[in-house]
């Protein structure tokens, strides 16, 4: 389970941090993602509309296990920060939607999409209302194909 901390000073400066409690090296790397970078979500279902986007905002973030664009924590040029935390109680669909409704994004790419397209928390709320999120299994984390229990 991960822990998130936030220190707020009287001068309105915020410091955030987190633990990444896996008990082994998650091979994090710093990713610098420029404006205009084209990205896409992962889906295994051709009926669902797979999301693709071009970043309006550049951002810097930490990835894990060598998954390119799979951001665990990051900060964009508008000052919006995000952290994905390991919370076993989190439940998301474990397969992508099969209909042709709104865009579908896997949780692995969600943080990067938010950082690349949203300037404020209100933007995030609006954006999240326009997508369906699913929890793609990530076998690289453990031998099981269980999905990754994460939370924003």
Where is each model-derived feature located?
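Accessory structured domains or lobes within enzymes
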Residues: 1, 8, 118-152
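Alpha/propeptide regions of enzymes that mature by internal proteolysis
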Residues: 84, 88, 100-132
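A contiguous strand-loop segment
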Residues: 1-102, 136-139
